[in-house]
Amino acid sequence: MKTLLIIDANLGQARAYMAKTLLGAAARKAKLEIIDNPNDAEMAIVLGDSIPNDSALNGKNVWLGDISRAVAHPELFLSEAKGHAKPYTAPVAATAPVAASGPKRVVAVTACPTGVAHTFMAAEAIETEAKKRGWWVKVETRGSVGAGNAITPEEVAAADLVIVAADIEVDLAKFAGKPMYRTSTGLALKKTAQELDKAVAEATPYEPAGKAQTATTESKKESAGAYRHLLTGVSYMLPMVVAGGLCIALSFAFGIEAFKEPGTLAAALMQIGGGSAFALMVPVLAGYIAFSIADRPGLTPGLIGGMLAVSTGSGFIGGIIAGFLAGYIAKLISTQLKLPQSMEALKPILIIPLISSLVVGLAMIYLIGKPVAGILEGLTHWLQTMGTANAVLLGAILGGMMCTDMGGPVNKAAYAFGVGLLSTQTYGPMAAIMAAGMVPPLAMGLATMVARRKFDKAQQEGGKAALVLGLCFISEGAIPFAARDPMRVLPCCIVGGALTGAISMAIGAKLMAPHGGLFVLLIPGAITPVLGYLVAIIAGTLVAGLAYAFLKRPEVDAVAKAA
């Protein structure tokens, strides 16, 4: 029997995921097929307080059930649903709500700077809310491994609305002319229903860069500000840093100075990591900051400006300046320079690359390069020679920032700072940043085990998932707990993260790659010292986890079951 599963988004991401997983497994045993299209369903199971007023459910057998019972006894729950589901008739007055008057076919794109957690969590939230409204939906994830669940031209043509939940600039050319609403992954994840309502009301036709755009569309794009452009550059730079850092770590595994011997494997690994990947790091950062601002016309001057930042010694700070300068100059020329129609084709090929590259290049050589190089040299010297007290303070600040909003602007600002310092061979801050970023999900997992009676069944299962995400350095694993109880979760995590960051800096921990969590330990030399680093993570996790276990108020469901 084809069965539609509708889960109220207000029940929370963790509980919804748990129910979906358990009922899916039980459905296969009961020979039920869980589908997404309400038009093909023979039966609909609704988990929530009420059945949605949706004409798509008319005439179908519908069963309204409790999510706690579905999680605790999924097979029995499905058996009850099959036996007691009754034909449903939507109220006449409810045949024209937002879901009915709004779009029926929605395509969406999600993307975050690292392309790991927020990308997929936002996608799941959009899918859940859209299906709850009876909409057809498909979400394309622009993750770290490229586009997943790609939207086809036919699906774009049939779509009534495009939703883009992205913290970085993404290629949206295939959606030209379609009504589009843009938001962030954070809002799409935490305020899904409100964002979908706004999408229906505020979507405007999308015009790719280079074509005429309405003032509204242009102002919305600029409202994203410098932060989004910077994160776009960081997201493209990140794989380069990871690959280069791990190659350098493998080279060091043969001996700290083994790469100095020509013709050896250690020398080859150092050439790949330090001589190539790290050499391209700043140009890629600058190039894609400019790309985010001006689209393809900004890429060439951005890459050239980034390369000059390397050659002048101004490093990642110079690269950031070059990227923004190149992007805005290229955009200015593209939008303000008017040419006869016969010469318009020369703008993207000749005029924009030449003029913008000259302006950026001369500025980097004569105005920006040397002063910024002096600033970067001073910063690097201070970081490498600072005393223990300053190191502990810096580690505590960075650690606390990583736990403040778990994947939000403050978290990403600290992360971008650490990644940028890798270009100057300063590895201490990055070690503190990754260690602290692992604390929130690990602490929530620990709390659910220490104080099991204070958490309901779904939260206990969510704690197990958070432990795995924490080991992978995915701070967002703690978001379901923080969203439910922010006044207790966030202070506990910030204190634990600050402690971890402080210990990491105090022991002089170094991290060669900016991602991967504890699995980076599998690469010899990627983290040093290993034992001290583990102690730092464990200390912060214990403080945050035990503090939250003590402060946490018991859930009503958990108290009822204990009684």
From Swiss-Prot:
Stated EC number for the protein is: 2.7.1.202
Query: What's its membrane topology?
Result: Multi-pass membrane protein
Annotated transmembrane regions: 236-256, 274-294, 304-324, 349-369, 382-402, 430-450, 463-483, 489-509, 518-538
Q: Name one Pfam family in it.
A: PTS_EIIC
Domain PTS EIIC type-2 per the UniProt entry, residue ranges: 226-561
| Keyword Transcription regulation annotated | no
Q: Which residues form the active site?
A: C112 (phosphocysteine intermediate)
Q: What is the annotated localization of this protein?
A: Cell inner membrane
Keyword vocabulary terms for this entry: Cell inner membrane, Cell membrane, Kinase, Membrane, Phosphoprotein, Phosphotransferase system, Repeat, Sugar transport, Transferase, Transmembrane, Transmembrane helix, Transport
- Can you name one GO molecular function term for this protein? protein-phosphocysteine-sugar phosphotransferase activity
Q: What induces it?
A: By fructose.
Modified sites of kind Phosphocysteine: C112
Query: Which biological processes are named by the entry's GO terms?
Result: fructose import across plasma membrane; phosphoenolpyruvate-dependent sugar phosphotransferase system
| Known role | The phosphoenolpyruvate-dependent sugar phosphotransferase system (sugar PTS), a major carbohydrate active transport system, catalyzes the phosphorylation of incoming sugar substrates concomitantly with their translocation across the cell membrane. The enzyme II FruAB PTS system is involved in fructose transport.
Task: Output this protein's name.
Answer: PTS system fructose-specific EIIB'BC component
The root-end lineage is: Bacteria, Pseudomonadati, Pseudomonadota, Gammaproteobacteria, Enterobacterales
Name of the encoding gene:
fruA
